[in-house]
């Protein structure tokens, strides 16, 4: 059996960026839950038409069967009890709300430019997402991680990605 590492954090915590770098360092496959839930259209995720949870679960199962060593980035990783045994480690990426929200706005501007500003065709959609992200309870991830039986590593998502990757690689290899 391979190794599954779950990176959890609220929107803007940096779990996708960290997950890609960690997967590369370990030679693992990277899976982003956004890719499971939101089909890509014109190289951009279609947030307006998310897949159903069952479809995302099926896609995740396919990924895990094909790539037994993987890093999954997800807010919680709650894909159902059948998936919990797939994770040998879980990582909580914690970042203060103000920083997360700034990252989300910066990322949105990077993706959509002026389209996400007032008057732009993405303005309402992006603002709705920012309100949603800001309203999420800070303990959402922590509470969900308590349901797992694998070790949970806490991480400061404000630190440089390279530093966190090295820390995680040491934690995982040292056990």
Located regions from the model:
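Walker A/P-loop
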Residues: 16
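Conserved AAA+ ATPase "sensor/coupling" helix adjacent to the nucleotide-binding pocket
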Residues: 106-114
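Small-molecule kinase domains that catalyze NTP-dependent phosphoryl transfer to phosphate-bearing small molecules
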Residues: 113-164
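The conserved Walker
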Residues: 11
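Conserved phosphate-donor/acceptor-positioning beta-strand/loop module used by diverse small-molecule
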Residues: 86-107
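Hydrophobic anchor at the beta1->P-loop junction of P-loop NTPases
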Residues: 7
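Loop/turn-to-beta-strand initiation segments
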Residues: 66-70
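Conserved substrate/cofactor phosphate-moiety recognition/catalytic segment
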Residues: 20, 24-62
